[in-house]
Each structure stands twice: as C-alpha cells, then as structure tokens.
Amino acid sequence: VLRNGALAVVAGTALALAGCGGHPDPGPLSAMVSPAIPPSVQEIPNPLRGQYEDLLNPLFPQANPAQQRYPAWPASYDASLRVSWRQLQPTDPRTLPPDTPDDRKYDFSAIDDALTKLANRNMRLTLGVYAFSSCCGNSYPDSTNIAIPDWMRPAATAYPGRPNGSAPGVTQVVPNWNDPGYLDAFGQLLAALGRRYDADERLAVFEFSGYGDFGENQIDYPRDALGAPGPAPDESAVALGYYSQSRDQTITATSIRRLVEANVAAFPHTQLVVAPQNPEIVRELLADDVTKKLSGPVGIHPDCLGVQSPLPSWAESGDSHYVQSGDAVVTAIKQRLLSAPVITQWCKLPGGTGPRSYYEKGLHDVVRYHVSMTSSIDFPDRDSTTEMDFGLYLLWAQANSAAGYRYSVEAQPGSQSVRGSVASISVVWTNYGSAAMTEHWVPGYRLVDFTGAVVRSLPATVDLKTLVHDDSSQSREEAVPASSSESVHVDLTGLAPGHYTLRASVDWQQHKPGASHVVNYAPMALARDGRDGSGMYPIATLDVPRDATTPAHNR
C-alpha cells in the first residue's frame, strides 16, 4: 500500500528535541552508515556518463585482445553514430512526386538498425549527420571523397587531391556552405530526421549538423591541404558577419542562423550538442531564446581530449579576440559546461607527445571542464598490439570513471530527533563526479516494512542538477565533491509496530511527449552499497515497538 504525503522533507538540519529529564530524545530513526565507493575502485554505469561506444565501436579494454590483463569495462548505456548525407538521401527529391513519403525520399536504414540493436542492449544513440569528411575512408570510388548526394554536387567545389597526404590523388568534394540550394536541401533533411526520430526516446542526443569537416564546425583540412582557407582575420567580420581568427571558417552568420533554426525546429524534444569550434554557431545555440524552444540547454561536443582543451582556443586563449574583448559568448560557453552534457572524443597521440602526459591531460581536463562522456576510440592504446602500461591504464581508467555524475546518499548519524509523533533525520546527497546529471531524474524516499512493502513515500527536495563543484584547477585528478543536506520527517501516526527501513532512490523520468518508442531505465546506480531489487538504497532504520502508543493506537 502506498500512501503519499506520510513523509515530509524540508531543507536544513533537524534539531534534537529534549525528552524526559531534559536529555535529547533521538527517536526511533537510526542512520545506516555506508561510505561512498571511490572512483578509483569501481566504475558506476549510468545513462549519459562515462565511456561510450563512439561511432559504435565497443568499449575498451575488452575490445582489444592485447589488453586481457585488464577487467572488462562495465557496459555503457550510450553509443554514437554519424551518417553521411550521401547515405541518407541518394535519390534526387526533384525526381519524386511531391507527396512522396519520407521513408521513400530517404534511406533511414543505418539509423534504424543502430537504434534497434542498441535498444536491445538497453542503450541509446547520439546521432550526427555530415556533408564532408576529410578522414578516413577505406576506399574512394572513382578516386573521389564525397559525402553529399550526387545531385547536390552543383552546390559543392571539387578540389584535386594532393599527391601526398592521407588520401593521395583523391578528389575532395566540399560543399559550398553558404549556397542557398545546399542550405534548403539540408534543412529539409533535418526536418525529415526530426519527424522520424525527435519523439523516439532511443535517440538521446542529436549533434548540431550541416557544417564543417565531419560535422565539427571547422574547415582546417580545406584550409591546410586544399588551399581553401576562410577570410583573413581583418576581413572576416565583413565577409562572414563575425570575427574569425584562424581562417578556419567560411560559413556566414546568415547561413548559421538558417542551420540553427533547422536543427532546433527538427529536435525540440531531444538533447542537442554542438562542436564548439565556430564561435558564432555557439553564440546562436546558447542564446536564451533558443534554450526556451528546447527540452534542455544545448551541450558541448569537443574533440581531441588528451591533446586540446575541451574549450576551443577562441574561448580560452589569451591571444583570442573573443577573450581580449570580453565577449559574452566566452562566459556563456564556460557556464554551459556546468549545466549541459559535455561529450568528448579522445585524439590521436601527436608526434613528440609522451603517452603519460597525454593521459594526464585527459584526466585533468575531464575534471576541470566537467566532461560527461569519454569516447571508446582514438587514444593511443585503443588498437595497440602490446599490453597497455599499468600506470597509463590507471590514468585512463580514472578519466573514464571521473567523467559525468557520481551520486551517493547517506543519513547523518546523530542527526535523528523526534517531536511528538514525527521522527526526523538529516540526509546528505553528494556528487563525486566531474559533472552533474542533466536529464530528468527524480530523487525520493520510501519507508519499507519488514516484508519489503513500500508503506509511505515522498519525493526529496534536493536539486541534484546543482551538485557540481566549479574548480579551475588544472591538475586535479578527482572532482571536488558537492553536497546538499535536507531533513526527512516520518509521521509515526498510524504506523503499525515493526521494523522499517527508510530508503532513497533516484527514479528515471526522462520522457518525450507522445513518444514513438519509450525507454525506461531502473533507478540510478549510486556510488554506495545496499541497492535492493527495486533500485533503492537503505539509509536509516525505524523501529516501532509493540508497546508504542500513537494517536492511531489509542483510539
């Protein structure tokens, strides 16, 4: 039997009240001590945190036969996929009747297959779409690297491939990012993807799509290898509508607004993230009027963990125009790290960089920049044929274990008290992870009798999303814990004699309106012992003796 309202929770610390003889009466509640499990001891899997299957690649170390010395990493709840526009829309829509349904205009099979397979493993998908990728095809038909449909080639430029490099002699087809035909057709693609997947709870995250190399909002490769740089810094404000310091941008502010509107309109109920290389795209997506249209604030998807900071140089370097001018977008992106997912990808080890300094930087940046998720690929030992050095493994494991939220809860010994028929105890929630949770999880308490039946229930008042410590230290290997306490009050009126436990849980309530596919997860795994079959954790006992007298038993 579940009776709501029989527990009460208020912020603050309960005061012990005087009983007979003026001595404090602790009452019937008694705290159960259960220390938090350190990140260096045990990984705690939960949705949207820790190591994820990047580009559907299995987790490390179990994906590498050379690493059998190390235990398998606990299963992830998340995987990512990027699909080329060419794969999604091979047929020119102008050759089809106007009333052609989406599933005939587009080939959704790669996405559908990934969603189905991941759901069978209790996982969700992070999805992105790209229109150009300089790396790393296994083969190039007709010696051409192209990620847009053939019918879109009039809105692109074909650059002859260099005789040396990663793809010698291969023609590179790069979209003209400001072409109205390109923007219109890509906007229609986004709208179709939204119609099909925005209400699908198997899709957890959609990456802002439509611009840059592999959808990462920069054109370094065309600038460096194809002789196609963006405008010079002193010309960029006029040419683009915003300042570009490194000649790695060619998209205009007007085109950015079109892509932002298309992405936001397509996925209002799905978490969006953005690769932060373009400051104007970040400015638009982090604006308050955009946030109001979405289910949550747009997150950040930086590349190159272990080599580059998760914050782009335009937001952090002392030489940056945006930093020197005190542009508000710098503050906005730094603050956003605290309130939205930060999904990272490791980077290939550069020449001249030692692996220890690489993994140390990765760990320090996970903690400092509130990284939520770390990729399963692209770090030096991922595909190594030799066993990973144990010291390096410890650094790698700590980076993955520290990423994201890591909550625990405990009742405070000695905080219990009783006033009349109401027993109270102070409860502390702590986040030991680098980031706070960003999805809709609801903490609460239940009073459970000796048979395991829930007899009383009430949500907690703590806001777990606020439990994150903002620390600018550049070399911290563990996040600074962030805690909040509240008092739980149990009304003993009408409670039958017996032994009870007060249990805490954090329940999954992340759902989309009118969902086409529903995802339900068990309560959050907390970094402590005692989880029962319902996902609850005992934090205190309550004993009501047979000779107890309450108003209900005096009648």
Model-derived regions: residue spans:
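Aromatic- and acidic-residue-enriched segments that line the glycan-binding/catalytic groove
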Residues: 134-167, 215-240, 291, 297
